[in-house]
From Swiss-Prot:
Record's protein name: Protein VP3
Keyword rRNA-binding: no
E.C. numbers: 3.1.4.-, 2.7.7.50, 2.1.1.56
PROSITE patterns: SAM_MT56_VP3
Signal peptide (residue range): none
Superkingdom field: Viruses
Residues covered by region (GTase/RTPase activity): 556-692
Organism: Rotavirus A (strain RVA/Human/United States/D/1974/G1P1A[8]) (RV-A)
Principal location class: virion
Length: 835
């Protein structure tokens, strides 16, 4: 959903668009709530309130002020991520395809021959980091840039087994045009760039678990963040390989040698970060022209010093000369060295060239060892070739994708590797490594152990759900880690599957009830964005690839109506009720009937079940941005801080009724996941509330009326406003509560319109207009530890006779209250009050 705020209405009609006029009779929160539950994708918000826009954005719903028709057209035609703190819109708009254009935010690609393999008549455009270079296209009142690129297609091609790039590109563009936008992937980079600076500013020690290549630039500015990944492929792992021969396989039609070099250097930088927590000087031997240096410098400021007879235009300092063994003493401490020296074959005989390459490999290793043998804080990445060779058993082997699989690979060495044991590796084993292993991640740090780290802030995005982790260990980590942001895959199945297949792995699934947390927020991607200053125009869809975002140790926990709140809680319900269901009242009717309340007159205004909890349960796949457990807990301890809106405090029994309705809904839908979730939420409610039931009552509150429009044979027909189980010394507390509620009690607009047999030999009249006051009275008694109400649903009725009678229907008549009293069952009246 996107909310576009306008001062004036527009004449043009847009598809899937609805207009909302600010209601001045309601406050900003109530207007925001009403907007959030509208069912169209685009909301044109007229006569808007800035406070309402802020509320929506903090809830993760993109709400932007629009000042011109051009701005409106730009935002209504595509989805976007909005940095509402800095007023920056990041469009995810692929309409540039209509210019016969694909886009990249990686400069090195523009220096390759990729243009020869594009679709006929198409071009490649460099748009800068997250599309920053496109800002000049939009002369808007807010900062706007188009972050959409085709780098995902290019990178997927590089790692695929396909060679024909044009066919691959064509298929992927067609897929993009016929499937829903992967909005979370597109906005994730914006999110990471917003998230980590804010965390590092607050927390000195930060752990990041499971980063992938898409984050390779994000963390360049954060050397102090400790990374954990899947570990490195080291020399001693080659013992499992059987010898093979040269393969000579083409990987890419266009030249990706620069991409390989960039990955090698970035891998080395992150390896250095995890050892020394600071930025190194980067020395490079060979690898000209290294256009990719420009890409790295767009993200972070590094000093590059390079040696190569050819130009390296983006290097900080370039020596247009060869580098020799004797030059090693020119290299300073606190640095990384990338050795990419190899003579081009040209027209040379392959045997002669092979001999030179092997000599250069030995020379490269000698330079590496000499560099690492003196000084401090050094890491080296060195180019090697498949040959009989001795290497340290702890050396890290790299084989990032390159244009052709031939005989080259790389090794990362640190100061400890050069003093460890070396192992002889035959040429055939290195070929086996080259032919069968592709390094898929620039992060080669050790795997994360599922243990708490009291002094660290742990970030684990999309990293811990894999079934090679113990599910219980993941739960324990989340329960016990004081400060963290961790995601787990939400259980979107209908059969309550404990794990699901995703790509080539299995992931555990989770529900919010799997965790026992306090001072933590459990929300969706959208809800998490709102907490960190972002909002999004396309909410998460229940695709099966959805995650719970669990934030431990946040100062936003008590701000119940500002973050991870109830915005949009009824949206899915509205979509169903106003399009597919038997009546728009279907939800109200079902909730009452499933709790054996058969008086449906006015069910939409006087419902006996919490609609919030009911919708949060049955449609949890659509509205799990709302942190239901937090909402319940803060209510249970009386610490609900509400800024605005039409606030209604639910009685705990209303929440229980909602769970019962949700369970019946789940049974009818054969939804085992909702069934378990509702059962566990009901258990949680009973855990945090101290609910007691007057199932064996000794007192009741009665209401006597001036007159009753039915025949009766009881002595005094009355409405039982609830039963109590109290000791005699609590009578005073009950009377005090009734006196406090006197005005509200006598203001009740009670009406009746029919009679019915409540049970065998119990003839009663219905009573409407009672429930909201009953639940307020329930809350007052609950807070004073007075047992009030039974475990079955309270059905307001007026007892007329204890014999069988014919039912009667009349026009609804308002009843005037004569008195309200407290009486002992089968005893005397102990308190009576009149208006």
């Amino acid at each position: 959903m996107k909310v576009l705020a306008l001062r004036h209405s527009v004449a043009q009609v847009y598809a899937d668009t609805q207009t909302y006029l600010h209601d001045d009779s309601k406050d900003e929160y109530e207007n925001a709530f009403l907007i959030s539950n509208l069912t169209t994708h685009n909301i044109l918000y007229l006569n808007y309130s800035l406070k309402t826009l802020k509320i929506l954005n903090k809830s993760g719903i993109a709400a932007v002020e629009v000042q011109s028709p051009d701005e409106l057209f730009a935002l209504i035609r595509c989805n976007f991520t909005y940095d509402y703190e800095n007023n920056i819109v990041y469009l995810h708009d692929y309409s540039y395809y209509t210019n016969n254009e694909i886009r990249t935010d990686q400069h090195w690609i523009t220096k390759t021959d990729i243009i020869d393999y594009l679709l006929p008549g198409w071009k490649l455009t460099y748009v800068g980091y997250n599309g920053k270079n496109t800002r000049g296209h939009y002369n808007f009142s807010f900062i706007c840039q188009n972050a959409a690129t085709d780098d995902d297609i290019i990178i997927e091609y590089i790692y695929s087994n396909e060679l024909d790039f044009q066919n691959f590109l064509l298929r992927k563009i067609k897929e993009r045009m016929t499937t829903s936008l992967p909005i979370a992937r597109l906005s994730n980079r914006v999110f990471r760039d917003k998230l980590f600076p804010s965390i590092v500013n607050i927390h000195k020690k930060v752990i990041n678990v499971g980063p992938r290549n898409e984050s390779m630039f994000t963390f360049l500015n954060f050397p102090t963040i400790k990374q954990f990944s899947n570990g490195a492929y080291i020399v001693k792992h080659t013992i499992k390989l059987k010898q093979e021969k040269w393969l000579g396989k083409r990987v890419s039609q266009f030249d990706i040698g620069q991409y390989k070099n960039m990955l090698n250097v970035v891998t080395t930088i992150y390896y250095y970060y995890n050892l020394y927590y600071s930025k190194p000087i980067i020395y490079m031997l060979g690898s000209a022209p290294s256009y990719w240096i420009y890409d790295i410098k767009q993200y972070s400021d590094f000093t590059f010093e390079t040696w190569d007879p050819l130009d390296t235009p983006y290097s900080t300092t370039h020596h247009k000369e060869l580098f020799f063994d004797k030059d090693v003493n020119k290299l300073k401490d606190n640095s990384v060295l990338y050795i990419d020296i190899r003579t081009d074959r040209g027209n040379m005989d392959w045997k002669e060239w092979r001999k030179i390459v092997e000599q250069q490999t030995v020379s490269n290793l000698n330079i590496a060892y000499k560099y690492l043998s003196t000084g401090k804080a050094k890491v080296c990445c060195v180019k090697l070739t498949a040959m009989d060779l001795e290497l340290p058993i702890t050396a890290k082997l790299l084989h990032h994708p390159t244009t052709e699989v031939r005989s080259e690979f790389y090794a990362i060495l640190d100061v400890w590797d050069i003093i460890t044991i070396k192992r002889f590796i035959p040429k055939g084993v290195f070929y086996a490594f080259i032919n069968n292993v592709t390094t898929e991640n620039v992060f080669i740090q050790p795997p994360f152990k599922l243990k708490t780290s009291p002094t660290d802030y742990i970030v684990a995005l999309y990293a811990l759900s894999n079934d090679f982790n113990s599910r219980q260990d993941v739960i324990n980590l989340i329960n016990k880690q004081k400060q963290s942001l961790i995601t787990v895959r939400i259980n979107n199945t209908f059969k309550d599957e404990p794990k699901v297949n995703f790509k080539n792995i299995y992931d555990w699934t989770f529900l919010p009830t799997d965790f026992e947390l306090k001072d933590s927020i459990i929300t969706s991607y959208d809800g998490c964005l709102g907490i960190f200053g972002l909002s999004i125009s396309l909410s998460s869809k229940p695709t099966g690839n959805n995650h719970l975002f669990i934030i431990n140790g946040t100062d936003k926990y008590d701000k119940l109506d500002q973050y991870a709140n109830h915005m949009g809680i009824s949206r899915r319900s509205h979509q169903i009720r106003f399009s597919e269901s038997a009546t728009s009242y279907s939800g109200y009717i079902f909730r009452d009937l499933s709790n054996n309340n058969f008086n449906l007159i006015g069910t939409n205004v006087e419902n006996s079940v919490s609609g919030h909890v009911y919708n949060a349960l049955i449609y949890y796949r659509y509205n799990y941005a709302f942190d239901l457990k937090r909402w319940i807990y803060l209510h249970s301890i009386g610490k609900v801080a509400v800024e605005g809106g039409r606030y209604y405090e639910h009685a705990p029994i209303e929440l229980i009724y909602a769970c019962r309705s949700a369970k019946e809904f789940a049974i009818l839908q054969d939804d085992l996941t909702v069934l378990r979730y509702a059962n566990e939420i009901e258990g949680y409610i009973n855990k945090v509330y101290s609910i007691t039931y007057a199932d064996d009552p000794n007192y009741f509150i009665g209401i006597k009326f001036n007159s009753i429009p039915y025949e009766y044979d009881v002595k005094i027909p009355h409405l039982t406003l609830g039963v109590l189980f109290i000791s005699d010394n609590m009578i005073h507390d009950v009377i005090t509560a009734l006196k406090k509620m006197k005005t509200e009690l006598f203001k009740m607009e009670i009406s009746t319109s029919y009679t019915y047999m409540l049970s065998d030999n119990t003839y009663v009249a219905n009573a409407s207009g009672v429930l909201s006051t009953y639940f307020k009275l329930y809350n007052m008694f609950y807070r004073n530890h007075i047992t009030f109400g039974q475990s079955r649903m309270f059905i307001p009725h007026i007892t007329l006779s204890f014999s069988n009678k014919r039912t009667v229907r009349i026009e609804s008549i308002k009843l005037r209250i004569n008195s309200i009293y407290l009486r002992k069952i089968k005893g005397e009246t102990v308190f009576d009050m009149s208006e």
